[in-house]
């Protein structure tokens, strides 16, 4: 367990799941109002200090438990910073070295740094920087109302960022220009602009050459439903552009997605229930099943409620470390609220 137990882990609140559900539902509703924000100005990246409190156990009820199906908990961090723009983390990509990362705030900010480890456990964040995400004119995306940045995908030195509220994807030459890169909008696929408000683009995955769908950017909505009630997805570029669907089950919505080294897609999903509060799960989808017109589904690797060390988990990244282990990194969106947390959690996936 964490060294300092958050107030909602107290006996009274942890037993009152209905109250927790109401709390989180209210929080998500308030985020719409909170978007009336002070807009950032284009400026050099700011070096920031990030304080990290260890999360030593994932199962609050059984702190000694490390194995969760095919996933083994490595450790985690609860992150805090006095920097005013820190928070709201909605996506993350961790480099192949397992240390350097870049993340997004849903208010239109980059957050990058380096994870330091004690053995295999995350132990802190160093070399942290934040900067506003820039549009094609060199001004912050937020200045044009494009601040709901929710997803990120990587193709070598190119980054793709999805902006939910305006149903837009922008491309950055991050490898050459770093945090000063300007985003260039790419043409949206058919049906993209008709996604519902605040339930639009939530996950991006780029498929590298050599895999099925190589060269394709996969985009998945949070809860843009087709006629059958399944979640809408899109294939941009690559050999087979078009639309597909992810089978929706148990009222879960999509939060993020990441590609496994072998090619399958992991979906991070989230559900709010009036009875059980907040729930998250990770589902595995075969890449070969994703094609225009298909409805895809797959096994659940992890499902967790508030009896586990979770918050509003929104970002998922996968990398293979020097030892050949497949490592999952998750990050949460604290909605800039003092009673929520920015959690960074890591698991090792045992490949079947």
What are these regions (language model features)?
Residues 2, 7-8, 21, 29-352:
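Sequence/structural signature of beta-propeller domains
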Residues 17-25:
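Sec-dependent signal peptide recognition
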């Amino acid at each position: 367990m964490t060294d300092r137990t958050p107030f909602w882990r107290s006996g009274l609140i942890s037993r009152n799941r209905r109250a927790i559900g109401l709390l989180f539902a209210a929080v998500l509703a308030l985020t719409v109002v909170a978007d009336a924000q002070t807009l950032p100005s284009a400026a050099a990246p700011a070096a920031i200090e990030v304080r990290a409190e260890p999360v030593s156990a994932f199962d609050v009820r059984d702190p000694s438990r490390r194995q969760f199906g095919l996933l083994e908990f490595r450790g985690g961090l609860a992150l805090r910073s006095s920097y005013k723009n820190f928070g709201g983390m909605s996506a993350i990509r961790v480099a192949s070295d397992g240390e350097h990362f870049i993340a997004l705030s849903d208010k239109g900010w980059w957050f990058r740094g380096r994870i330091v480890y004690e053995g295999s456990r995350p132990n802190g964040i160093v070399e942290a920087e934040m900067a506003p995400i820039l549009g094609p004119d060199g001004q912050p995306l937020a200045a044009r109302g494009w601040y709901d940045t929710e997803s990120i995908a990587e193709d070598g030195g190119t980054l793709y960022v999805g902006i939910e509220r305006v149903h837009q994807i922008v491309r950055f030459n991050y490898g050459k220009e770093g945090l000063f890169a300007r985003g260039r909008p790419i043409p949206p696929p058919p049906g993209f602009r008709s996604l519902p408000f605040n339930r639009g683009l939530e996950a991006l995955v780029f498929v590298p050459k050599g895999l099925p769908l190589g060269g394709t950017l996969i985009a998945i909505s949070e809860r843009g439903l087709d006629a059958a009630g399944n979640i809408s997805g899109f294939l941009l570029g690559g050999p087979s552009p078009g639309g597909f669907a992810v089978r929706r089950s148990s009222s879960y919505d999509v939060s993020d997605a990441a590609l496994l080294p072998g090619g399958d897609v992991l979906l991070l999903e989230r559900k709010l229930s009036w009875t059980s509060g907040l729930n998250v799960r990770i589902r595995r989808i075969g890449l070969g099943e994703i094609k225009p017109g298909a409805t895809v589904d797959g096994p659940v690797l992890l499902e967790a409620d508030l009896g586990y060390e979770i918050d509003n988990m929104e970002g998922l990244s996968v990398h293979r470390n020097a030892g050949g282990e497949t490592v999952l990194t998750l990050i949460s969106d604290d909605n800039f609220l003092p009673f929520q947390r920015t959690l960074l959690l890591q698991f090792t996936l045992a490949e079947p």
